[in-house]
């Protein structure tokens, strides 16, 4: 198990000079707040944050979903996600276990956010020229 939630890894913490994203709101590209960061998922081999675990708002299912770090931009007060809209967090693929992620689950999650980069809105689907 290479990538695990911080709750299982007591020896890891966010560096004091960095902003701790736990508790920050997460918003989609449309500015709609989708939920709040509840946990960090750590890659133990490389000692980096790979995912934010988000608790979505009740109108978006009230589920816990993962947001890949590389699809996130951490601001002063919120985390912005350019690839999908706020309401699209409701359909992020889930995990079978709350304490581990499989390679297939990683692929599905990355594909969901990556696909949103091209298909989240009708405007993104058309050619630029």
Model-identified regions with their sequence ranges:
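Peripheral interaction segments used for macromolecular assembly
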Residues: 1-129
